[in-house]
Amino acid sequence: MINQGPVITIDGPSGAGKGTVSQLIAEKLGWHILDSGALYRLLALAVSHHGMSSDDVETLKVLAEHLDIQFQQSEEGKVEIILEGEIVTQAIRTEEVGNCASKLAAIPEVREGLLLRQRAFSQSPGLVADGRDMGTVVFPSAQIKIFLTASAEERAQRRLQQLQQKGEAVNLGGLVKKIKERDERDANRAIAPLVPAAGALVIDSTNLTIEQVVEMIFAETAKAGLV
């Protein structure tokens, strides 16, 4: 694997704040960003669109390798995600798609199919990679590895606020249950389980602001001589 620039990996469970933190760090450094979770969500949406079975692992692998996706920046500066010619930026963020993506991520052939696509994001001047196995599998030689976590209750509360802002009626208790189930599935899968990478800085964001987390990671970046 040949990296085209330095890499910061930010791994952790759903709702820990990886996406927001990664975007802010990437903007601050002027680096590229990889939202690996979006790739699995895109695959889940494509599987649904094509009426495919999650048991047909070889077909899933081929779909993962050849998924027709684009990331385009809008005039407002936001990144629009396009699947097979259709803008799906919001469609991939539903709970249903997220749960399906988590199940697909437990299939070794699917992870293998997406591996090279993820590594291709590593380009100069640098990359901030957000996911669950960025530091352990996808970019094991990354210069900085972060494992960002928070309590299940805090992550459920954050997700509740996001969904309520979208006008969705959700139950906090149900969200906590789903998050704990997903945590267990991610941590116990046979391939690329969700664990901190060797040498990773573990940050518990339960009682921290986004700004505090960003400053902690930026301090590590400066200490490593990357800025």
Swiss-Prot record:
Per its UniProt record, what CDD domains does this chain match? CMPK
Q: What is catalysed by this protein?
A: CMP + ATP = CDP + ADP; dCMP + ATP = dCDP + ADP
Q: Which residues form the signal peptide?
A: none
Q: What is this protein called?
A: Cytidylate kinase
**According to its UniProt record, where is this protein located?**
Cytoplasm
Q: Which domain of life is it from?
A: Bacteria
Q: Which GO terms describe its molecular function?
A: ATP binding; CMP kinase activity; dCMP kinase activity
Query: What InterPro entries does its record include?
Result: Cytidylate_kin, Cytidylate_kinase_dom, P-loop_NTPase
Record's keyword annotation contains DNA damage: no
Q: What is the taxonomic lineage of the source species? A: Bacteria, Pseudomonadati, Pseudomonadota, Gammaproteobacteria, Oceanospirillales
Q: Does the keyword Cytoplasm apply?
A: yes
- GO-annotated biological processes: nucleobase-containing small molecule interconversion; pyrimidine nucleotide metabolic process
